[in-house]
A protein has these predicted regions:
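Accessory terminal regions of nucleic-acid processing enzymes
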Residues: 1-236
Length: 236
């Protein structure tokens, strides 16, 4: 039996991933993956940098860590479904029903009504807990999708852990409605800053260009030398 909320999510239409429509929609939203930065709890990105990105001044095409994570995401999902007896589906970018400037793309939703969020860290140590900077993403996704539970999946394949064992950790997270009530005003204020800077420009938050100073070593002036010479009384 498919959960009623999941059934509605699966029947909805979504823009294809990476399509022009998907990029346009995403550019006009504060997404779940942006939430920690907007709230100031992401140690890897400053709020100012996210504003610049949303205004088109910064572009992120991925790095080694994100490419690695994308490479093993499907594998991690399959392992989870096999171990937990779940059936999972992927859906596209979903706006919040009441706040359409908020959106998110889950890594999966199960037919039993759980959100899946998958992380395949390249170097970070996996612990049996959710890193604080990922919790806003999970909570916002549960709000957007109207789901009450989430499985936070962390996976390191043999390619990374060899000669040690594969690492696969699943943390169960419950929806926290109070978190959303407390965070919504902060997220909205941040989004209003984005809209303001889109209209007025970003000159006031652009990183200052560092001017390198060239230090020229000047030659020291010649020292005055006093020479005392012996002389005869007739010469002095």
């Amino acid at each position: 039996m498919v959960h009623e909320v999941v059934k509605n999510l699966l029947e909805a239409e979504y823009a294809p991933q990476r399509s022009e429509e998907w990029l346009r929609l995403r550019g006009n939203m504060l997404t779940a993956s942006d939430a920690a930065t907007a709230l100031g709890t992401n140690p890897y990105e400053k709020p100012r940098d996210l504003i610049l990105k949303k205004c088109g001044h910064k572009k992120f095409d991925g790095n080694q860590a994100t490419f690695h994570g994308n490479k093993y995401e499907d594998e991690a999902r399959d392992i989870f479904c096999a171990q937990y007896g779940e059936v999972a589906h992927e859906i596209g970018l979903r706006p919040h029903p009441d706040h359409p400037w908020l959106g998110g793309s889950p890594d999966g939703i199960t037919e039993s009504g759980k959100l899946l969020e998958i992380k395949c860290p390249l170097r970070r140590e996996i612990k049996e807990e959710v890193p604080v900077y990922y919790m806003p993403q999970l909570q916002l996704l549960m709000e957007i999708l109207n789901l009450e539970e989430c499985y936070f999946i962390q996976y390191k394949p043999a390619e990374i852990t060899w000669p040690g064992p594969v690492e696969f950790v699943v943390v169960h997270v419950l929806r926290d409605r109070q978190w959303f009530a407390d965070s919504l005003p902060v997220l909205q204020a941040f989004w209003e800053k984005v809209l303001w800077h889109r209209e007025h420009g970003c000159a006031d938050i652009m990183p200052k260009t560092r001017v390198s100073k060239t230090v020229v070593a000047l030659a020291e002036p010649p020292k005055k030398v006093c020479i005392i010479m012996d002389c005869d009384e007739e010469d002095c």
